[in-house]
Amino acid sequence: MVVFASISGELPLDETQKAALLSFIEAGGGFIGIHSATDTFYSWPEYGELTGAYFREHPWTQEVRVTVEDATHPTTQMLPSTLTLTDEIYVFRSDVRARPNTQVLLALDASSVGAAGDFPLAWFTTYGAGRVLYNALGHFDALWREPFFRAHLLAAIRWTAGR
């Protein structure tokens, strides 16, 4: 299990380390990306394939409503159907929903920011035999103190580890 939480920029992984990470996940290892884990490794296209998207912008930092789109998944079963929270909201360079084998778990209720459009915030996919989960939330410390967020992340760790 590998977790990249709130990383950004071009990190100092050499080609051997990058290949080892992808091989680990392809062989059945788990990967979780949290918040700015999509704002890194822009020059490594396989990483974008792994996470499902690259960060484009964060136009909203405010109180928002988040909708649970898949309440049956082990990482969202404990969540109410709608969450109200304050965070920095990411928008991505590509359409996450268009990716094969990808299921959106959480999405922004666009009406809560006076916008139109589709804004996925958390999803899961596979990479080879590995399970991958990404959640764009988690910019502010206050969210990490919320029991629902910690429960969701703990369930994500268990799920990506295959438990």
What does each model-found stretch correspond to?
Residues 113-119, 126-163:
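Extracellular ligand-binding/catalytic regions of CAZymes and related secreted enzymes
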Residues 3, 32, 103-105, 133-135:
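Hydrophobic/aromatic beta-strand patches that form the interior of the parallel beta-sheet core
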Residues 53, 58-129:
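Catalytic beta-strand/loop cores that center a nucleophilic Ser/Cys/Thr
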Residues 7-12, 31, 37-41, 73, ...:
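Solvent-exposed loop/turn segments at secondary-structure junctions
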Residues 17-20, 43, 71, 149-153:
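Stable alpha-helical elements in mature extracytoplasmic
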Residues 1-41, 129:
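Short alpha-beta junction capping motif
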Residues 39-50:
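Glycine-rich, charge-decorated loop segments at or immediately adjacent to ligand/cofactor-binding or catalytic sites
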